[in-house]
């Protein structure tokens, strides 16, 4: 019996060793990759942008025709129903975001994803968005079912809007592991729409290879967005309030919305009556570590401004003529600490994968070498026999 369990022939031992090394080199790296591939449960990710010089409008005061509250010293700002730029505040702005994941009890192939994003002027919250999705852990796309929830709140005016049990398409915070050099549908939380985020180039951040993606949304009407989605009132603690489509449009003489240069550009007289509404546009540059699909850097150039229609909004953006009518505008990038934290998060995984690549290559090389040695031993024994 021992004869069969413990082969005495050196040739047999060489063959066994070759098989072991080949199995190690072939099986172990993919096993680790498959283990780290799905979106992990129990993530708790905090990101914050570096304080960025930006502008925001006291829109409620402007719409109500109240005394100008902005930081402009223009004499016109002392007038009743002052021009729109008299309500602008120039501040250091930041965006904070917390994103968490959790398991879905009924299906371990899915994960809950929840996020809270807050826009701050100093310590003062200007707006916040909460979002809930159920994601496929392999693709990081939301499931094809009405599982999503979204809420937008303006704390200063104690109002907002919410959506529940709707279906969305496109990734948002998580890219799939094994990110490819191609375009992906990207869901924008502010506009509630999905458009392509496009691969642009590769680069290294602190020695880690990353893929760069660019996402751009042409100016779109937030009034149209509000009209095209089904929303619910927001219970802000002092009663349920909801932004309606009519709340997004305001009217008045052109001189209240456009200075002389802008009126010349748009062909308007000071007394022409105009109706304007908020338009939103954003350009994003995203850096992704492709093995894990982890976002390691994000820059967003956000503009929300008043314009009469889509054509005028496009003209204003093309001529960089949006600031005086800005509801919000800032070019924001993750802080150095946030980028370092995200890179530190992926660094151990990258090191392990690189080590396993060496193990895989070495295991296969040793296994092949041992098989060649076994073949030589067999041929020599055959000749001697």
Question: Where are the regions a protein language model picked out?
Answer:
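N-terminal short leaders/motifs
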Residues: 144-161, 233-248
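Extended interaction regions within the primary functional domain
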Residues: 88, 218-219, 357
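Juxtamembrane interface at the cytosolic side of transmembrane helices
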Residues: 2-15, 29-31, 351-385
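Membrane-proximal low-complexity regions enriched in glycine and acidic/polar residues
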Residues: 184-304
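Short N-terminal edge-element motif at the start of the domain
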Residues: 157-192
